From Swiss-Prot:
Exhibits poor salt tolerance but excellent tolerance to low concentrations of ethanol. EDTA has almost no impact on activity. Activity is increased in the presence of Ca(2+), Mg(2+) and Co(3+) and inhibited in the presence of Al(3+), Zn(2+) and Cu(2+). Urethanase is a promising biocatalyst for degrading ethyl carbamate in industry. However, since ethyl carbamate is not a natural substrate of AmdA, the enzyme shows a limited catalytic activity toward this substrate, hindering its industrial applications. Variants that improve urethanase activity could be good candidates for applications in the food industry. The active site is at residues 98, 173, 197. Its EC number is 3.5.1.75. This is Urethanase. It holds the Pfam family Amidase. The lineage of its organism: Bacteria, Pseudomonadati, Pseudomonadota, Alphaproteobacteria, Hyphomicrobiales. Optimum pH is 7.5 with ethyl carbamate as substrate. Exhibits relatively high urethanase activity (greater than 70%) within the pH range of 6.5-8.5. Has excellent pH stability between pH 6 and pH 8.
Length: 517
């Protein structure tokens, strides 16, 4: 057997042609096999070329699966102990990495049985940056299956419990990271965000989580959902932790097309000075459309306790010298519909049909994960949970019968939402609304039907998904307890003005214990 692809058989050519509705004579089949020989020669040559890999600079062992005693809320997927540089700004910090991020030699499953057994051979760009800064990586945090859930019960290693009430959803999909920070098991953590997955669990677990400006933090070496929505960012127990971690992981990366020339070598990534800025003179806009949702469209209804808590936080900002006024962005209410089309069809194309990497972008491709996932999808597709099956079925339905028309229209419309936010942010420094309209919801039984499961796990995104569309930096800040459960307020700023979010969060933290507000 030659190294590389084999020449196709007649049956394989006919099968491919049939998939596209192309009738072929025996002569045409023979012609296509002959034409394939040139491509086979190129592919075999490509097979011999050593593949460029992302670097692995620090020694480590594979680690271990945590015991039940070590992991009462299922916040961990895997434990390890990887020591970084001897000195650096993250020296002494213990960091958990969401299990969508590759760490060489450490098992990775992206919350899914389909990837169980996969071990990356590379470190994601942000992992190398953290280790170079002296961090100690102490494990992979649990996440939802393929990260496509906003609740907290689809992780294949078991549902992740809310630290304030284990019977309730912790928010998702970066729920493991939020839980580990909330319970003091780590100092800092990495989360991913395509529809709110950093900010949602931060809100319901009472921690800080920043979805950075799109492209600011390299996504290279992380599992993709949809290339135009993918974000990765810091989570912490304080704004200082956010600033410290963001300062290390942000910046130019030639392998990430999401940066699109907006971030160049030498881009300033020091966010620590923002901690001392305060909010005096800052103009803060309360987003009218972020409050008062009635839930009639199936999304989570607003809880008056949450709305009042966030509005009370605005009074704190006023007391600190900020100017606060209400604004209206009607496009905020349609953003969820735009996100739905991009999320459904984009994930189907990238995450499933594209084997987790997709095509048509210029950057570093994780070929080992793509091959592993493709084989798993073919041999055991039944391992997909109800949420992922639902996304796949719906996404493929719209692709197959409506020819990506609505995906394209949604991509065109997202720029109008971006412009609407930019208009307000040309007059204000920050836009504020509840991160999630309601308090943490009760978990449904893992054996619940598809409808109950999907609704329970995907109805929290109304306020968060919009900034994944626009790319604006957006941060969840804990602002109070109601009925013993955390409430998060979401702060949004201009593109690449992540520092202003950190400044506002630090000022609010200094104003008093959020648990008593």
């Amino acid at each position: 057997m030659s190294l590389g692809p084999e020449l196709a058989t007649k049956e394989q050519i006919r099968e491919i042609a049939a998939d596209y509705g192309l009738p072929m004579t025996d002569e045409e089949v023979a012609d296509h096999i002959e034409l394939l020989k040139g491509a086979i020669a190129s592919y075999r040559e490509l097979e011999h070329i050593p593949e460029r890999k992302l670097p692995v600079k620090y020694p480590r062992t594979p680690g271990w699966r945590p015991t039940t005693q070590e992991n009462p809320l299922n916040g961990w997927y895997w434990r390890c102990e990887i020591e970084g540089a001897k000195e650096g700004p993250l020296k002494g910090d213990r960091i958990a990495i969401k299990d969508v991020v590759c760490v060489a030699g450490v098992p990775m499953m992206n919350g899914s049985k389909l990837l169980e057994g996969y071990v990356p051979e590379i470190d994601a760009t942000i992992v190398t940056r953290m280790l170079d800064a002296g961090a100690t990586i102490v494990g992979k945090s649990a996440c939802e299956d393929f990260s496509f859930s906003a609740g907290g019960m689809t992780c294949s290693t078991g549902p992740v419990g809310n630290p304030y009430d284990p019977t309730r959803n912790p928010g998702a999909s970066s729920n493991g990271s939020a839980v580990l920070i909330s319970t003091g098991q780590v100092d800092l953590a990495i989360g991913g965000d395509q529809g709110g997955s950093i900010r949602l669990p931060s809100a319901w677990c009472g921690v800080y989580g920043l979805k950075p400006t799109y492209g600011l933090v390299p996504y290279t070496g992380c599992a993709m959902i949809e290339g135009t929505l993918d974000h990765v960012g810091p989570m912490a127990s304080s704004p200082k932790g956010i600033a410290k971690l963001l300062s290390v992981i942000a910046g130019y990366d030639a392998d990430d097309p999401r940066q699109q020339g907006r971030i160049v070598p030498g881009f300033d990534t020091n966010y620590l000075p923002a901690l001392e800025r305060g909010v005096k003179g800052m103009k803060i806009a309360i987003l009218k459309e972020g409050f008062g949702h009635d839930g009639s469209d199936g999304m989570l209804a607003s809880d008056p306790l949450v709305d009042d808590c966030v509005r009370s936080a605005m009074e704190t900002f006023r007391g600190l010298g900020a100017e606060v006024a209400e604004v209206s962005i009607p496009e905020h209410l349609t953003a969820w519909h735009i996100w739905t089309a991009i999320g459904l069809e984009g994930f189907t194309a990238f995450g499933v049909n594209g084997n987790g990497v997709g095509t048509n972008w210029n950057g570093w491709y994780n070929t080992s994960m793509a091959e592993y996932l493709a084989r798993a999808m073919k041999s055991r597709p039944y391992d997909m949970p109800a949420t992922v099956r639902s996304v796949l079925i719906r996404g493929e339905y719209f692709r197959r019968y409506y020819h990506n028309r609505y995906y394209g229209k949604a991509q065109n419309q997202r720029h109008l939402i971006n412009e609407a936010y930019d208009r307000v942010l040309s007059e204000y420094d920050i836009i504020v609304c509840p991160t999630i309209p309601g308090l943490p919801t009760k978990m449904v039984d893992r054996d619940a039907g598809t409808l109950d499961t999907v609704v329970n796990q995907l109805n929290q995104l109304r306020n968060t998904a919009v900034c994944d569309l626009t790319g604006h930096p957006s941060m969840s800040v804990p602002c109070g307890l109601r009925e013993g459960l955390p409430v998060g307020m979401m702060l949004t700023a201009k593109h690449f003005d992540d520092a202003t979010l950190i400044a506002a969060a630090a000022a609010f933290e200094a104003a008093g214990d959020w648990r008593k507000m």
